[in-house]
């Protein structure tokens, strides 16, 4: 009986204790479900503030559609960022085809003529263009650090688009792309400003390019003209476009150091030459061939930047030459006979112009007539027998720097006389 009462007593005592334990357990579970307080460090707080400010600055640019319309492409969804150096640029998202479209159409001469835009690549070429006053409309770059190399005021109104370097590498014509490609408004020689060092050493020496159709040759010729101190370069119709990418690369910035006037008719060429300018033609005529009869050739290159007979000759309608003493001279065009002299003899004593013809089509009849009208001559560059002629770019460099030497010597003699 005592055992039975003791068991009942223990059950009554343990029951409230078990209930109390159950309540305590529930309280502990509820306490564990509470979210702990987050401790924010000072650096994390600053980082979050910057993220909030950056998110507020993400908004579409107002001139994006206008910029895309100018280059003939549709606008894409991009992010706008404001770097520390205050340049606002767009980050092109994956699938953005603006670069490929712009580069493709900018390499077309029809596009350049229609829209008046040219494509320049590389930091040096872009810098020279900006210094000369050319207007940069759109700049594609792969690294933000590249923007620091340009004057900030030159990029204020420019559409800056950051793209992956791989995209530039695909569309670049350079072996080692620099990650910079710019779309410029086609420069106008009247509105451009040239370096003071270039204008200070400018000579009364002009260059006329006649049927230069190789881009590499034309670019090299322009570079020689800038180095020799020519006052201007005139390109007649038939020459390759001076703003073709290959010409720009070979020119090494010569386009922005002296006036280059393109697509000229021969009728207006004299309007761009100073009064009293004598016109001289590059010629590979050899004195020992003077008494030899002219040979008829079907190759246009044989009538290249040179003539074969110093006497007056005619050209028939079928393109063949004939001497002036032949019986039938009907339906033939007159080609003037010009005196020939060696290039190292004195010829550059005043304002003068040198005409360089292309290696394929050579000098035009209009260039010969202009030289005759100005009392000019043909300049011969002696070469070893067996060598037909020199490259047009090589001939231009020889004649231009010889003209530079003669003009400078003449100026020195005149200065000594006046003193």
From Swiss-Prot:
Organism: Xenopus laevis
Protein name: rRNA methyltransferase 3, mitochondrial
Subcellular location: Mitochondrion
GO cellular component: mitochondrion
A Pfam family the protein falls into: SpoU_methylase
Coiled-coil zones: none
Reactions it catalyzes: a uridine in rRNA + S-adenosyl-L-methionine = a 2'-O-methyluridine in rRNA + S-adenosyl-L-homocysteine + H(+)
Biased composition, class Basic and acidic residues, residue ranges: 44-56
Main function: S-adenosyl-L-methionine-dependent 2'-O-ribose methyltransferase that catalyzes the formation of 2'-O-methylguanosine at position 1370 (Gm1370) in the mitochondrial large subunit ribosomal RNA (mtLSU rRNA), a conserved modification in the peptidyl transferase domain of the mtLSU rRNA. Also required for formation of 2'-O-methyluridine at position 1369 (Um1369) mediated by MRM2.
Keyword Acyltransferase annotated: no
Source taxon at top rank: Eukaryota
């Amino acid at each position: 009986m005592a055992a039975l009462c003791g068991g009942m007593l223990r059950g009554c005592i343990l029951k409230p204790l078990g209930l109390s334990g159950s309540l305590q357990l529930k309280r502990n579970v509820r306490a564990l479900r509470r979210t702990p307080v987050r401790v924010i460090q000072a650096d994390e707080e600053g980082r979050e503030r910057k993220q909030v400010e950056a998110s507020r600055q993400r908004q579409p640019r107002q001139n994006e559609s206008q910029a895309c319309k100018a280059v003939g492409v549709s606008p894409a969804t991009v992010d706008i960022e404001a770097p520390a150096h205050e340049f606002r640029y767009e980050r092109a998202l994956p699938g953005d085809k603006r670069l490929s479209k712009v580069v493709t159409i900018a390499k077309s001469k029809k596009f350049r003529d229609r829209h008046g835009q040219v494509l320049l690549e590389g930091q040096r070429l872009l810098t020279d263009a900006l210094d000369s006053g050319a207007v940069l409309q759109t700049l594609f770059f792969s690294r933000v650090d590249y923007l620091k190399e340009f004057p900030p005021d030159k990029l204020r109104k420019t559409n800056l688009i950051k793209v992956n370097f791989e995209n530039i590498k695909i569309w670049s014509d350079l072996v080692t792309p620099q990650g910079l490609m710019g779309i410029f408004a086609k420069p106008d020689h009247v509105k451009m400003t040239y370096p003071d060092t270039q204008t200070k050493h400018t000579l009364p020496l002009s260059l006329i390019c006649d049927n230069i159709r190789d881009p590499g040759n034309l670019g090299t010729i322009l570079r020689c003209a800038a180095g020799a101190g020519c006052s201007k370069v005139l390109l007649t119709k038939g020459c390759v476009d001076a703003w073709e990418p290959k010409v720009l690369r070979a020119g090494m910035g010569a386009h922005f150091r002296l006036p280059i006037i393109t697509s000229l008719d021969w009728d207006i060429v004299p309007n761009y030459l100073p009064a009293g300018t004598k016109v001289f033609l590059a010629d590979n005529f050899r004195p020992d061939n003077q008494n030899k009869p002219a040979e008829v050739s079907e190759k246009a290159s044989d009538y290249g930047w040179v003539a074969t007979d110093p006497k007056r000759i005619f050209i028939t309608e079928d393109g063949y030459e004939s001497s002036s003493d032949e019986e039938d001279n009907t339906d033939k065009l007159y080609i003037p006979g010009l005196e020939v002299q060696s290039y190292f003899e004195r010829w550059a004593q005043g304002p003068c112009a040198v005409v360089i013809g292309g290696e394929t089509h050579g000098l035009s009849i209009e260039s010969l007539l202009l030289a005759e009208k100005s009392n000019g001559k043909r300049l011969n560059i002696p070469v070893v027998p067996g060598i037909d002629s020199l490259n047009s770019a090589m001939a231009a460099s020889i004649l231009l720097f010889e003209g530079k030497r003669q003009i400078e010597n003449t100026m020195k003699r005149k200065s000594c006389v006046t003193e």
